[in-house]
Amino acid sequence: MPDLAHVIREISEEMAQRSDRGAVADYIPELARVDPDQFGMAVIDAEGQVFTGGDSETPFSIQSVSKVFTLTLALGMVGDRLWKRVGREPSGNPFNSIVQLERERGVPRNPFINAGAIAVTDVILSGHEPREALGEILRFMQFLAQDSGIIIDETVAASEKRTGFRNTALANYMKSFGVIDNPVDYTLGVYFHHCAIAMNCRQLARAGRFLAHNGVNPSTGHSVVSAERARRINAIMLTCGHYDGSGEFAYRVGLPGKSGVGGSILAIAPGKASIAVWSPGLDAAGNSHLGRIALERLTQRMGWSVFGA
């Protein structure tokens, strides 16, 4: 088995030398200001050892990576009844597509596209005030990462709200079909805020560990979800975690993963490691360009693909 610390150091150096970095998300003004010349990586192995490279301690907006954790929470609240409100199939369309939602009568294709994540957020909000629902999401993230210092970047949340016209359209369209129960403004407020949670690579990798270990957070021994549910969340991450780039990610990386337009990717090597990478420059599908390349090299060198070494 190759030395993991050496592999991560090697990959970080390779990423620092690349000139093709993608383009930062410019439709959220606060994200457009992020320096694209950054790359960070953290891997936590089965024994709990942490290996890092590059800008692994720099906080970033996790954006759609939060959808893994809101899905986990919603499933804990309502179980498989959630799947009456959202599907489990890849979309093959941009993450904020309105056309697909219209064709499918307001039921989002999966919980990781924007419409699906808004519907999942609405489930968490039901029976709560928005502040309470958001607090529950944030505390869950802090608990998983074992770090009470994780915060919501209010500036990013406000920036998303000011420019979130497409998400508002998606939410209103779902509301017209009865998929959204709560006031649209309340649901979107919680959604924009949980996407604006700020974490670094080390924190994000720690938060994802339960998905690498049959639903158990090995740091605490706490069972977050059942082994079956962990496998199913990983399956949705593999098939739907990178929007219309999910097939390419599965082909090249071969791990369950979830990306965010802030440039981060959480990837899971079941039984082996939880991995977080971050580089703000995105590819055409809205996924971290260097993040995907780094993960491809990591799985190749460590033999971690779920499809075989």
UniProtKB/Swiss-Prot annotation:
Annotated residues for binding of substrate: S64, N114, E160, N167, Y191, Y243, V261
Assembly and oligomerization: Homotetramer.
Reactions the enzyme catalyzes: L-glutamine + H2O = L-glutamate + NH4(+)
Keyword Hydrolase appears in the UniProt entry: yes
Origin superkingdom: Bacteria
NCBIfam families given in the database record: Gln_ase (TIGR03814), PRK00971.1-2 (NF002133)
Documented EC number(s): 3.5.1.2
Similarity comment: family membership: Belongs to the glutaminase family.
GO BP terms, alphabetized: glutamate biosynthetic process; glutamine catabolic process
Protein name: Glutaminase
Keywords: Hydrolase
Annotated SUPFAM superfamilies: beta-lactamase/transpeptidase-like
Listed GO MF terms: glutaminase activity
Primary enzyme class: hydrolase
